[in-house]
């Protein structure tokens, strides 16, 4: 039924604002395509590769729907307000001219779809599949010609159907796999893929290339196929951001970057309504709702939602600390931790509270501070029901129930439930007294000792007996006094 639907003529309406005059030179697929070298492709995780496939198919479909790209057939010149492009199935008796122009779409799609079949391997640039196409014609020209002509027709129909779909509503992982299967069935009928053993027993990928680039020597296997050396080899950045001057190899990368300046977040989570600037960020976020953790540490078996989190975690096992502070020489396993640390030296506090105006060096600290104003205590103890504003406070509290004392003194072996208590205890062994009185110069090992001492200078007596009304400067003195009433 799906195949029958694709054979039916499809009408595409293009608004005057988005349509480009075909007589003045269209933007071709190569103008907006993004290609990766083998090393670059190897750095992408699964979600990023899936995003790449989505973007390539989306761009190719949109270019094809405007009648641009590789010279699609049945083009009509634009009229007053709208342009209607009719696509119908090619007949066996179509002209050679149209067959060749339609046939150009097939190798491009083959390159894109090859990535779906070979994750993590070198992506094939345009020309790999074209050469395979030419090699097959060497054995059966007429049979191949008719098959490719019909195939290109179906691909075109499919692309026009794709152009009707609102691509901003695409859900990576849902719509895309179905579209890939549909395109693959049209481009690779019978499940056959390029780069396989052909009728003469020769592996196409082992053939030598004949058409080379004069700049870098990169070869193309079809004389009509451009070699994309500027973006892959020289590292030349073609698209520059007008706001900050940062340059990118692909136009789509620039569009993504510009959302940093515009604040645009077109991708919405249908679970919680949160918006994101990139589909890859949305995919990472969705795992919060699904609980999916597809990335596993081979050392300890710990699971992570994002590949980047796994990479950061693995530095615990390797001990790698590649990010060093230029001020004090301290090194960190994560760049984000270094950035936070550097604010100690710069004094930068970029996160400001809208209620009281206090500023903070980290967003997490600001979030904790805001709970003072809201009174929110989201962390509840499962044992006694007591709630806390910070997760760290809940963890400390839970040790009251469990009796856990994870902090051990290396000098005497005594253990403590909190690191701060261990730090105070160690001063017994070291003799450190970091808290000094500004009035008399007397120093103390604990801040509480200094506070108690300062009452001597101020004359303050905050501790009052509820029996006789006498007041005292220290709590211990009040407790000693109350024993008189008890006797």
Swiss-Prot record:
Interacts with HNRPK. It holds the Pfam family zf-C2H2_15. Expressed at high levels in gastric glands, and at low levels in colon and small intestine. Silenced through promoter methylation in gastric glands with intestinal metaplasia. The lineage of its organism: Eukaryota, Metazoa, Chordata, Craniata, Vertebrata. Residues 27-136 form the KRAB domain. The keyword DNA damage does not apply. A zinc finger (C2H2-type) spans 239-261, 267-289, 295-317, 323-345, 351-373, 379-401, 407-429, 435-457, 463-485. Its main location: nucleus. May be a transcriptional repressor. It is found in: Nucleus. Belongs to the krueppel C2H2-type zinc-finger protein family. GO terms for molecular function: DNA-binding transcription factor activity, RNA polymerase II-specific; RNA polymerase II cis-regulatory region sequence-specific DNA binding; zinc ion binding. InterPro entries: Ikaros_C2H2-ZF, KRAB, KRAB_dom_sf, Znf-C2H2_ZIC1-5/GLI1-3-like, Znf_C2H2_sf, Znf_C2H2_type. One of its GO terms (biological process) is regulation of transcription by RNA polymerase II. Residues 79-94 have a biased composition (Polar residues). Residues 71-94 are annotated as: Disordered. Keywords: DNA-binding, Metal-binding, Nucleus, Repeat, Repressor, Transcription, Transcription regulation, Zinc, Zinc-finger. GO terms for cellular component: nucleus. It comes from Homo sapiens. This is Zinc finger protein interacting with ribonucleoprotein K. The keyword Electron transport does not apply.
């Amino acid at each position: 039924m799906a195949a029958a639907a694709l054979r039916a003529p499809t009408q595409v309406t293009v608004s005057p604002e988005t349509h480009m005059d075909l007589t003045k030179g269209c933007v071709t697929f190569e103008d907006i395509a993004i290609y990766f070298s083998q090393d670059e492709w190897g750095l992408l995780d699964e979600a990023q590769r899936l995003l790449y496939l989505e973007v390539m198919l989306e761009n190719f479909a949109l270019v094809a729907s405007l009648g641009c790209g590789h010279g699609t057939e049945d083009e009509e010149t634009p009229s007053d307000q709208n342009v209607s492009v009719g696509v119908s199935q090619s007949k066996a008796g179509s002209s050679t001219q149209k067959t060749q122009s339609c046939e150009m779409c097939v190798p491009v799609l083959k390159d894109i779809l090859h990535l779906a079949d070979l994750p993590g391997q070198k992506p094939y640039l345009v020309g790999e599949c074209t050469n395979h196409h030419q090699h097959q014609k060497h054995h059966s020209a007429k049979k191949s010609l008719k098959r490719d002509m019909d195939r290109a027709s179906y691909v075109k129909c499919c692309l026009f159907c794709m152009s009707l779909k609102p691509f901003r509503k695409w859900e990576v992982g849902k719509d895309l796999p179905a579209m890939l299967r549909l395109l693959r069935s049209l481009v690779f009928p019978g499940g056959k893929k390029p780069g396989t053993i052909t009728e003469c027993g020769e592996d196409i990928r082992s053939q030598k290339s004949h058409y080379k680039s004069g700049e870098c020597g990169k070869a193309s296997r079809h004389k009509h196929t451009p070699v994309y050396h500027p973006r892959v080899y020289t590292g030349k950045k073609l698209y520059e951001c007008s706001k900050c001057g940062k340059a990118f190899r692909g136009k789509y990368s620039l569009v993504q970057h510009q959302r940093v300046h515009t604040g645009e977040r077109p991708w919405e989570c249908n679970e919680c309504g949160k918006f994101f600037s990139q589909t890859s960020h949305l995919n990472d976020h969705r795992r919060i709702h699904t609980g999916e953790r597809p990335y596993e540490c081979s050392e300890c078996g710990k699971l992570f939602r994002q590949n980047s989190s796994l990479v950061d975690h693995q530095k615990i096992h390797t001990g790698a600390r590649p990010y060093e502070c230029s001020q004090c020489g301290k090194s960190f396993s994560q760049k984000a931790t270094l950035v936070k640390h550097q604010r100690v030296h710069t004094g930068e506090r970029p996160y400001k509270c809208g209620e009281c105006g206090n500023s903070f060096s980290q967003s997490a600290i600001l979030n904790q501070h805001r709970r003072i104003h809201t009174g929110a205590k989201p962390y509840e103890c499962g044992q006694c029901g007591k709630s806390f504003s910070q997760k760290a406070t809940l963890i400390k509290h839970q040790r009251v129930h469990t009796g856990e004392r994870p902090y051990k003194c290396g000098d005497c072996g005594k253990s403590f439930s909190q690191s701060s208590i261990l730090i105070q205890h160690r001063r017994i062994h070291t003799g450190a007294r970091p808290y000094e009185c500004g009035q008399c110069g007397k120093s103390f090992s604990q801040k509480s000792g200094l506070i108690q001492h300062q009452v001597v200078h101020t004359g303050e007596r905050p501790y009052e007996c509820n029996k006789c009304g006498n007041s005292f400067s220290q709590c211990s003195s009040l407790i000693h006094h109350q024993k008189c009433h008890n006797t």
